[in-house]
Each structure stands twice: as C-alpha cells, then as structure tokens.
C-alpha cells in the first residue's frame, strides 16, 4: 500500500511481482507502519503458556490466521475481535505437527517459540524446518532445562508434557534467545539466559 500511495503500479501474478515506478510523483504521503508480526506472534505464544489472559491490541488478526489456527488446534483459548486478540492458557494442550513456510505459512521465526509450547503438550509434536539450515540451535539449551527433543535431519520431535527446570543457558540468535526466556517463564526455579543482547534486535523492552 505504501508503494501504491507513491503512484507505483503493482501487478502480482503467482510468485511474480511486477512494479512500475513513478519517479515524477513528488507529493508528500503519510503511511502508518504495521506491527511486527513475529514479535506479536511471540506474545501470543507467551499467552498460551502463562496462566492469566493476555490481550494484544492494535493488530490485524487476519495477518495471523495460520498462527492462530495452530494455537487453537493445540487448545489455547483465543477470542478474536477486529483489532485485538485475547489468549489464555489451556492446561491440557494437544500435540501438533507443523512445517515452516514463507508467508502466509507458519514462519520459521516462530518455530523456536512454538517448540517451547510443544514441550507442554501431551504426546509427540513435530516441527519440520523448510526455510533455513541450522535452525535448531535452541534445542540443546531447552534440553538442559528438561525438554525431551530429538532432531532428525530437518525435523524436531518434541515429546511432552515435560517439566522444565531453570538452568543457565546460552542464546545463539534472536529467536532462540526469546524461546529460552519463554521457557524460563514456566520453568521451576531461576533461569539465566546469557548473550541476551540478541533480544534487543527484535524485542523492545521485553522485560516490561
């Protein structure tokens, strides 16, 4: 929509996008930046993990159809309104199998967070990573906290539910770091996450 406001002509056909620019347009335009999809998805998963109801406002739930559907299938209690989503924990989470895919599929940048939720679900859950290599760097750290996870090729097998115990763990990247924070929220005893500077790249004032 920003490009269209500048006068560009955009044509989308299948996986091909054609953009015809408009260099003659010098008019000022106003455009509102949308919320961060991955940051919001992280908080949705946090809401499914924690005890109290969480309400996330000023978002467009239509952008999260896949993520919300996954959380609903796992048993999370979700209510959707025009510009907000409320989510709360279900003590009897269900296992699920997912695979990462480019938008509008399930994002690779949420699989680490979802894996934490899967550790609390009954039965065997699976995540197949189709986007990046070496995307399961958080698994050894989650296992240190008591998670039962196996990696075979590009698929993670998560056995649950597992009782997580606080430990000193190390963040290897942005999404791995926030997954360890989520695990620490539900773990027994204190969790220390080292290399926390990774978080600052994607989460503003996460501690608040």
Which residues fall in each region the model found?
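Short, structured segments at the rim of ligand-binding sites
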Residues: 1-208
């Amino acid at each position: 929509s920003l490009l269209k406001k500048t006068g560009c002509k955009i044509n989308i056909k299948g996986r091909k996008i054609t953009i015809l620019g408009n260099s003659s347009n010098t008019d000022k335009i106003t455009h509102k930046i949308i919320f961060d999809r991955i940051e919001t998805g992280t908080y949705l998963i946090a809401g499914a993990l924690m005890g109290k109801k969480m309400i996330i406002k000023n978002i467009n739930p239509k952008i999260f159809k896949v993520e919300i559907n996954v959380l609903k299938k796992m048993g999370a209690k979700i209510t959707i309104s025009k510009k907000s989503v409320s989510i709360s924990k279900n003590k009897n989470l269900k296992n699920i199998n997912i695979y990462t895919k480019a938008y509008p599929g399930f994002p690779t940048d949420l699989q680490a967070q979802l894996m934490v939720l899967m550790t609390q679900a009954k039965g065997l859950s699976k995540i197949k990573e189709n986007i990046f290599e070496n995307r399961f760097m958080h698994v050894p750290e989650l296992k240190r906290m008591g998670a039962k996870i196996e990696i075979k090729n590009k698929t993670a097998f998560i056995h649950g539910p597992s009782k997580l115990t606080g430990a000193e763990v190390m963040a290897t990247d942005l999404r791995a770091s926030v997954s360890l924070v989520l695990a620490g929220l539900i773990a027994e005893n204190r969790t220390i996450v080292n290399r926390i500077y990774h978080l600052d790249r994607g989460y503003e004032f996460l501690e608040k």
